[in-house]
Amino acid sequence: MIGSPFLAGRDRYERVMEGWVDSGHGEAFTHTVQITDPDGGVEVSLVCTPSPGYEVRAAGARVRSGAADPGIAADFPDLAGTRMVGGFGKRLAELCGVRSGAVLFVDAGIEVARLARQVTKLPAAAIAGLDPGDAVACWRLDTTGWVDLPDSCFTYSPAGHALFGTRPVSTPMVPTLYSPPPGAPKIFTRKKVARLVLTARRLHLFHSMHDNVHGFDLHYEVDLDRGVIVAADSVTSRLPYAGICNEPQARIKSLLEQPADAQLRKRIQSLIGGSSGCAQLYDLTADLLKLLSLPVS
C-alpha cells in the first residue's frame, strides 16, 4: 500500500528547508541548514573544508521547535573529523539513532553536504579576469574546484561538454562561488519546499528548490488505485548552464506509468540520474520518495 507516515491524521504535509553558506577567514566554510515541518524544526551548522576534503572541522545543532530530542543536538559535535563523502548519511543515522526528530536532523546534515558542493575556495589568481557570463570558463573552473563533478550529470559529461560552441549557453555562476572574500556572509543561499497532498485516490508530490544557480519546481501525481505515476512535470527557471542543463530535464517523463513501489528508488538512478541525467532532478525526486511508504513488488 502506498502511503506516508507524514500524512498520518492529515491530508497535507509540508517540509521547508532553508540553507546558507558563510565564508570563513581560513580555508573552511560554515554551512547552516534549518528544516521545519508541522511537528517541529531543527538546525544543523557544520564548519567544513571545501572539495576535495569535505572534512567537518566543527559541528553544532539545535532544536528550534517541537519535540525533537535535544540529546541529538548535544551529540552533533562528535561529527568533527568526519568527511562528507560516501557513507556520511550512514554516519548521521548512527549518530541520531531512532530518537525523536532524528529524521529531520539526518536530512539537515545531508543538505549541508549538498551545500558544500556549491562553493569552493580557489586561489584568487584562478578567477582573475573571469567574466561571470563566460560559461566555458565557469565550466572549467567547476571541474577544477569540485573533484566529484566529472560525469556526475549530463552537463559534466563528455556529451554535455561537446555542446559548448554549438548553441547559446548562459550561466548564473559568479566569482564569489569560486573564491569568496574572507568572512563574507551568505555567499550561497537555498530554499527547498517538499509537499505531499492527498486528494481522494490521488497523491500529489511537489518539490521546489531555488538558490543562486538553480530553480526547480517538480510535481508528480500517483494514482493510488493503479499504483503508478500518472503525471510528472518540472519547471526549471534557473540552471547552472542553460542550453546544456536543459537536455536531461525531459527525462522526468520517463517516470510516467512507473510503478510506485520500493524498487522505484533504485530505478530512478538510471531513469533521471547518472551521467546522462540531472543530479538535482534525481535528488529532488529521491527526497520525495523518502517521504513515502512504498510496497515491495
Predicted regions and their residues:
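Active-site- and interface-proximal helix/loop "cap" or "latch" segments in soluble metabolic
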Residues: 2-164, 210-297
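Short, compositionally biased leader-like segments
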Residues: 165-203
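Two-metal-ion RNase H-like nuclease active-site motif
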Residues: 204-208
